[in-house]
Amino acid sequence: GIKGKGSVEISGGEVNVTTTEGDGIKSDECVVTQDTCSAAVEGKGIVAILGGKVTVKAGDDGIYGYSAVIISDSAEVPTIKVTAGTGTPNTSAGSGGMGGMGGPGGNWGWNGNNNNTSTSTTDDSSLKGIKSAILVYVEAGNLDVSSEHDSFHSNKKVHFNGGNIT
């Protein structure tokens, strides 16, 4: 993958990233003030895609910027295709619901599926398409995002003000 300790900025060209493990494009150690990295601080980072054609196939998160992921057309309209994990949403089936209620004077219904079997796997990997701890900001672009978990994820704010998303 691509990792920028301060930041990652793509403003044109064609970028193809494929990883079997880890994030496709990542930045996690930068504080940005007035469009420049002013100080490298642990746990901070910006990924800015301002143009170009970007294709990411990642074993974990597709694009991850701790502080922000910014997608804008300040250079040219970007085209972005991201596949995180297998690209197929992770779903699970329910275990059945409650049975019906008995009529007047009847008995309460029984659980529709009384098999309390459970299969659980613990996997700490994050398989999100575009992720930030603070801000995902989409102003423009053509985005095609497929992921096992959230396509767009932020612990604080996801902002859309343009773009075509599939």
Question: What are the residue ranges of the model-derived segments?
Answer:
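A composition-driven surface/loop motif
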Residues: 1-166
